[in-house]
Amino acid sequence: MPRPKLEVADVFRNYGPAYRREHAGHLNLPQLKVMSAVENCRTAALGGHVAACTKCDHQHIAYNSCRNRHCPKCQGAAAQDWMLARMEDLLPVEYFHVVFTLPAQIADIAYQNKAAVYGLLFKTAAQTLLTIAADPKHLGARIGMTSVLHTWGSAMTHHPHLHVIVPGGGLSRDGSGWVACRSGFFLPVKVLSRLFRRLFLEGLARLHKTGKLRFFNDLSELADPGIFAAHLVALRKTDWVVYAKPPFGSPEAVLAYLSRYTHRVAISNHRLVSAEANTVAFRWKDYRIKRGDHMRVMRLPTDEFIRRFLIHVLPSGFHRIRHTGFLANGIRRGRIETIRRLLDAKPNQTPVEAESDDPSDPQQQQPCPKCGGQMRIIQTFLRGQTPKSRAPPWEDAA
């Protein structure tokens, strides 16, 4: 895919300083760090190296990446690294994709209590799947799953939901056998939805009772226990959105899919159309359109575009990818070996191409743009240092 001509970094560099001044005191430290990281990514501010071709006289400078998990430019290499690490976990079984979505009324609470409510979303979604799968009426097995949190819709609005990838089966209670689910069917979504709703609302009530929720502005009145309890009443009667997508075509397709989902950010640079002092335009999918092309162009005031990007910054240290059940980090290796033995399956050896467009990664040196030869590093320089070479930046040389 060709490099985009416009980036979120351009918006931040051009209009970020004014945004920070106008919203001083209303931006938290993680948001400020993300803005700074995105602005400085692959610029001289972060240092870098000079690479020279081994066949011709071409040289170019590659500036370091910020490696921030919210940076649109830094996710390709991170996704590839993650995918390679997960290759050995693949099993020769069907894989299912289950999505848990929070209602709008809960999403509002989540926005003001990100760590607490997003954490509860992970916990209750996993508990729901583990409980229903363990029930002999459904599967009667101990399953495993990988969950990925997304907090955005296509228009960058706040829309928290959890993507859960689950192998189609699990270990028997005594661990002596593999229990496969029915072909093409995992678990009943209505049963999942009802249990998820109950577990989540119970957990949310506990968070409120123990003083772990904070409310401000339009939600300030929810600090009152009586008003908060009344607020949850209607949510107990509405249907919560839990749906299961059809199984993947192959275990390898799971990784290709996951690598696109695990390290996504609120918007990719390729979706940007234009950016001016007053307006930013970008492509988005309008799912209200039932037929034909869903893609539309949205134009937002520049301040609103930046605000929408920043509402998806996660709290420091919060893990947006989690493994549960037999895929939990502490037991995964042993459980995978046991399951492979039960299925008489060999370890996965399918190769995966680890492509990266990150020129600052010494392990992912791009070929010479002039002759296609191999590039090698001849000089490195730190933040604040000026390279001795007068070669152009990699983006201009490529």
Predicted regions, residues:
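Beta->alpha loop/short-helix hinge microenvironment recognizer with preference
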Residues: 1-398
